[in-house]
Amino acid sequence: MEERAQHCLSRLLDNSALKQQELPIHRLYFTARRVLFVFFATGIFCLCMGIILILSARSTQEIEINYTRICANCAKLQENASNFDKECTCSIPFYLSGKMMGNVYMYYKLYGFYQNLYLYIRSRSNRQLVGKDVKVRLNLIWYNTLFLFLNQVDFSV
């Protein structure tokens, strides 16, 4: 008979608050003091992060070198298909005014091209991005002229 009683007890559910789904409820009570504390603490945190970012941005050094016309001979050399095996080296000497600390990154800049602009998407050339010289397509001549015209117009009032 004892075995039967133990068998019945093992089939009963555990009497825990989790299994009986009687967990206590936790509710947030918003008071003016708590809301203002969180608001000002967030503001102070954002202010500190902004100061840190501004100070780190001031320590960067930037050098801009325009190489548009310096390496034009390489593009002319590669226009002729018979020169496919000839190498063209383009070097641009420049001098640094001081020592650069940390990592050095090099970027290039394109003027008048915006990635989300419809005309930029039409004018994108993967061959040019790889570094090969490309000729101007006829359907983009009007865009280039419009761009030159807009650069010459003075929009200031």
UniProtKB/Swiss-Prot annotation:
Glycosylation sites: N66
The protein, known as: Cell cycle control protein 50C
Family membership: Belongs to the CDC50/LEM3 family.
Location of this chain's protein in the cell: Membrane
Residue stretches spanning the membrane: 35-55
A GO BP annotation: phospholipid translocation
Keyword Membrane among record annotations: yes
Top-rank lineage group of the source organism: Eukaryota
Primary subcellular site in the record, as a coarse category: membrane
